[in-house]
Amino acid sequence: HFVPECKFCNKCVSMRIDVANYKFSKSEKRVISKNKDTKLYIRPPSVTMEHLNLYDKYHRFMNDKKDWPYTAISPDEYMKSYVETKEEYAKEFLYIKDDKLIGVALVDILPKSISAIYCYYDHAYSDLSIGKFSILAQIKIAKELDIPYIYLGYWIKDHFSMGYKEAYSPFEILKNRPNLSESSIWEKKES
């Protein structure tokens, strides 16, 4: 889905959470507790008007807050980007509160890893920290399924949109950009 665009920049670094050594902090336990009434459904990706409206609402908010570019997504664009796959590992995590869709996380669940592809949510429910809750739910599922890593995509230290990822410690960063015949070199980090 996402690849670095800058040819001579190495700031975007692949990162993964070390699930086996991950311990939920007190504040993370509070986030989990706040969401005790939030329902989580895991199923193959789909597209509904509720998905599209929430996706657009999230991106309008991020446009105002962080100056992200914003264009409403069409059903076809959403379908091509997130739904059209024949792979059984592609899932969506639906977060429902009071019978309303308040968050969607698009996730690949494989035998040895979970890959967090994308997450969007309703900022009207910011008190629930749905973005954090989604990552914590993925960590919990990875622990239950004995999956060693969760890949959070690219990380840039202290970046206003990607810096949050370093809170999920311990994590590892990819030290090289290997081709298919090379081994990956991962370095452990603590926040």
Give residue ranges: language-model regions.
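Active-site/acyl-donor-binding loops of N-acyltransferases
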Residues: 13-20, 149-191
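Conserved acetyl-CoA-binding loop-helix of GNAT-fold acetyltransferases
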Residues: 127-139
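Conserved acyl-CoA
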Residues: 136-148
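Residue-level preference for non-acidic, small/hydrophobic
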Residues: 55, 135-138, 165
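Active-site scaffold segments
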Residues: 108, 133-136, 153
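A conserved beta-strand-loop-helix scaffold within acyl/acetyltransferase catalytic domains
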Residues: 2-9, 14-127, 167
